[in-house]
A protein has these predicted regions:
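C-terminal structural segment of proteins
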Residues: 1-270
């Protein structure tokens, strides 16, 4: 159907972003293809050491899934913070990722969790890391005729810690920060780290240079948090806009990196 209608057709999953864009005439489609009628696209299953989430699974269903809460609690908690109850009840994870709204939560956390998506077309299927799916603000790297059908997230391991925090004043978040740490000894040392920032840049961005500063003993890492925050801000290429100045956003990154670090450790925010 998508190959038949081509650019005249839009993919409808939850519609929370799509219908708003069509109402404001920033998107115009003559046809909408409803994925919610496709059996199995709303499933949430465990397979080997991964959680497989169907593209039309709503934020609310992921938030409430016992399987997700048990195997990747950071994801369930993040989904409980998405937008509002109405959006969580109708909006889908697959639609959220494909629409690539810059001021959104899921992709930033999925980036540090090592999430990937499966996309399919009439000619075949392929898997894309979440970090390669989003090309920019409101733009994905899906090829013509491709549909996102599944999101795959690694299950948390006992020596893995992850958390997501955001700063939000208006309808959408100003900043989102995700952190994943590997620790062999109950958070006394960290052998691997992934950190990503979203909302302050066109698409979620890994702080690769910052990650090098987030490994080592807990005391060493805590001392390096300010330098790591600067590395994250540099990677995000901050600019002045209606959400605030680049300097203000850099300050937020400093504040929330420390907060999310302590949250990962199980302590209160500081």
């Amino acid at each position: 159907m998508l190959s038949h209608y081509g650019e005249d057709a839009g993919i409808y999953a939850g519609g929370t972003e799509l219908l708003l864009a069509m109402r404001h005439q920033t998107l115009n489609y003559r046809h909408l293809i409803d994925l919610k009628v496709v059996p199995g696209l709303d499933s949430i299953e465990a397979r080997d050491s991964f959680i497989e989430i169907g593209a039309t699974s709503t934020h609310r269903s992921i938030e409430r899934s016992a399987l997700v809460r048990q195997n990747q609690p950071a994801l369930a908690e993040m989904e409980s913070q998405v937008a509002n109850v109405r959006v969580r009840g109708t909006g889908t994870l697959g639609g959220n990722l494909c629409f690539a709204e810059p001021h959104s939560d899921p992709a930033t956390l999925l980036l540090v969790l090592g999430g990937a998506v499966k996309v399919e077309s009439a000619t075949g299927a392929r898997e894309i890391p979440v970090g390669e799916l989003i090309a920019g603000a409101y733009a994905s790297n899906l090829l013509p005729g491709e549909i996102l059908t599944k999101i795959t997230v690694p299950c948390a391991k006992p020596n893995h810690r992850a958390a997501y925090m955001k700063f939000q004043v208006h309808e959408r978040p100003t900043l989102g920060l995700g952190l994943w740490l590997e620790t062999p000894d109950e958070a006394r040392t960290f052998t691997s780290a992934r950190v990503a920032v979203g909302c302050v840049c066109p698409f979620p961005t890994r702080g690769l240079d910052a990650e090098k500063l987030l490994t080592g003993s807990r005391g060493e890492v805590e001392k390096r948090l300010p330098d790591a925050a600067d590395k994250i801000a540099d990677a995000a290429d901050l600019v002045d806009d209606h959400e605030g100045s680049a300097e203000y956003k850099r300050h937020l990154i400093h504040v929330f990196l420390r907060r999310v670090f302590h949250k990962v450790l199980g302590g209160p925010p500081v």
